[in-house]
């Protein structure tokens, strides 16, 4: 009887230990998810940036990599990537380099087509069209004969100009990953087609699927908020072998040198 009682107590203690330990892991995951949200919120709280030239007067998070007197540079990037089943991956996007020292911006509208042979991905083509930003308008700096393409470039809007993450704190049940040695971190959330940002992306791009996307917040560098590293967001609609549809966006603050 004593033996049975001891065994019962040991098993009970073990179960309590596992339960508490498991709760501890859950709390750690929840805590890390909160940290990741806070880290991204430093950038995403700026969205929507209606006038990109406002970034000339906005300073990001600095560290020892910045030289004294360097006001830094904002790098803004948005890109839509579509690979229909069995076809090449086609990307359309733009990147701007906004120098706060000179208050000038240059960048490129970029078209790429990448073919997956099954063994290796090869660049079939990449076309870059130089642009500048003046009075919050994208202006091609070289002649473009294709009027449709020219209009697409002039009317291009970065996700950071229309996206809104005011409800980021309410996103729940994220798949969290954190590697302090790399360092890198991420959080992934399943969205619905009723999500505000999903509606905005669908409004601007012809997305050949009704499937609702997953949102991936992906960062490198110090999770506590160093200016080194990067923060990227990705809306993944389809991710299969030979078929991919995803949208990427980033706003980074770096030394201008």
Curated annotation (Swiss-Prot):
Membrane topology category: Single-pass membrane protein
What name appears for this protein in its UniProt entry?
Answer: Uncharacterized protein SE_0114
Species of the source: Staphylococcus epidermidis (strain ATCC 12228 / FDA PCI 1200)
Ordered alphabetically, the record's keywords are: Cell membrane, Membrane, Transmembrane, Transmembrane helix
Instruction: Specify the domain of life of the species encoding this protein.
Output: Bacteria
Which InterPro entries did the record assign? Answer: Csa, Csa_sf
Q: Where does the protein end up?
A: Cell membrane
Q: What GO CC annotations are associated with the protein? A: plasma membrane
Q: Name one Pfam family in it.
A: DUF576
**NCBIfam families, A to Z:** SA_tandem_lipo (TIGR01742)
Transmembrane stretches, start-end:
7-27
Q: Does the keyword Coiled coil apply?
A: no
Instruction: Give the protein family.
Output: Belongs to the staphylococcal tandem lipoprotein family.
């Amino acid at each position: 009887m004593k033996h049975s009682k001891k065994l019962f107590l040991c098993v009970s203690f073990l179960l309590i230990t596992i339960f508490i330990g498991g709760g501890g892991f859950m709390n750690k995951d929840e805590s890390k998810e909160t940290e990741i949200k806070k880290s991204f919120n430093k950038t995403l709280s700026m969205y929507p940036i209606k006038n990109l030239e406002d970034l000339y007067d906005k300073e990001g998070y600095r560290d020892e990599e910045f030289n004294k007197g360097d006001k830094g540079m904002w790098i803004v990037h948005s890109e839509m990537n579509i690979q229909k089943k069995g076809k090449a991956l086609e990307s359309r996007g733009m990147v701007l380099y906004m120098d706060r020292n000179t208050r000038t911006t240059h960048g490129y509208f970029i078209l790429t087509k990448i073919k997956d042979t099954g063994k290796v991905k090869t660049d079939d083509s990449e076309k870059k069209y130089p642009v500048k930003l003046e009075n919050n308008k994208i202006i091609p700096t070289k002649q473009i004969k294709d009027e449709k393409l020219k209009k697409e470039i002039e009317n291009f809007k970065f996700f950071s100009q229309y996206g809104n993450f005011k409800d980021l704190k309410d996103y729940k049940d994220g798949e969290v990953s954190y590697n302090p040695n790399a360092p890198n971190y991420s959080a992934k959330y399943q969205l619905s087609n009723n999500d505000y940002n999903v509606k905005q992306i669908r409004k601007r791009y012809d997305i050949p699927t009704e499937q609702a996307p997953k949102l991936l917040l992906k960062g490198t560098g110090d999770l506590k908020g160093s200016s080194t590293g990067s923060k990227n967001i990705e809306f993944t609609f389809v991710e299969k072998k030979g078929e991919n549809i995803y949208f990427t966006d980033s706003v980074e603050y770096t030394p201008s040198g």
